[in-house]
UniProtKB/Swiss-Prot annotation:
Compartments, record wording: Cytoplasm
SUPFAM superfamilies: alpha/beta knot (SSF75217)
Xref: Pfam families: SPOUT_MTase
Function description: Specifically methylates the pseudouridine at position 1915 (m3Psi1915) in 23S rRNA.
Binding residues annotated for S-adenosyl-L-methionine, in chain numbering: 57, 88, 107-112
Originating gene: rlmH
Catalysed reaction, written as an equation: pseudouridine(1915) in 23S rRNA + S-adenosyl-L-methionine = N(3)-methylpseudouridine(1915) in 23S rRNA + S-adenosyl-L-homocysteine + H(+)
Keywords: Cytoplasm, Methyltransferase, rRNA processing, S-adenosyl-L-methionine, Transferase
Superkingdom of origin: Bacteria
HAMAP family reported in the protein's UniProt record: 23SrRNA_methyltr_H (MF_00658)
The keyword Cytoplasm is assigned to this record: yes
InterPro entries: Alpha/beta_knot_MTases, RlmH-like, tRNA_m1G_MTases_N
Protein name as it appears in the record: Ribosomal RNA large subunit methyltransferase H
Upper taxonomic lineage: Bacteria, Pseudomonadati, Acidobacteriota, Terriglobia, Bryobacterales
Single GO cellular component term: cytoplasm
Length: 139
């Protein structure tokens, strides 16, 4: 299993990805992880990752606690299926992509800047791996 994090658009602050990169580097001990900023008109995630599970962050998505998020990662590991995560841009997700997602997930009922959502998602991925392996980070 490999984890891909895609973000639509670039952050305003060039240092905004540092925290997300740190958590993904830590998660990389358990599974290869890749993070990239994209433009929807230049990539088709279904062609690039035909068998991967597409999990997109959306305010109207399914609320999920950390234990359920870890279970989702575990399922991906057991199936050997890549996980593709996407955080939309300032205008949200492209409607056609939103409709095709395998799962829409909400990080919170609150609204956060996209830069913070990147860090929060990366941290939850790392936390999920730590939960599955009883790593002391989760305590």
């Amino acid at each position: 299993m490999k984890i891909y994090l895609y973000f639509i658009g670039k952050p305003k602050d060039p240092h905004a990805n540092a925290i997300a990169e740190d958590f993904l580097a830590r998660a990389g001990r358990y599974s290869p992880c890749e993070m990239r900023e994209i433009r929807p008109e230049r990539i088709d995630l279904w062609t690039k990752h035909p068998t991967a599970r597409k999990i997109f962050l959306d305010p109207a998505g399914k609320p999920m606690d950390s234990a359920a998020f870890a279970a989702m990662i575990s399922k991906g590991e057991m199936e050997g299926r890549d996980l593709v995560f996407l955080i939309g841009g300032h205008d949200g997700l492209p409607p056609a992509w939103r409709a095709r997602a395998d799962l829409l997930v909400s990080l919170s009922a609150m609204t956060f800047p996209h830069e913070l959502a990147r860090a929060m998602l990366a941290e939850q991925i790392y936390r999920g791996f730590c939960t599955l392996r009883n790593h002391p980070y989760i305590r």
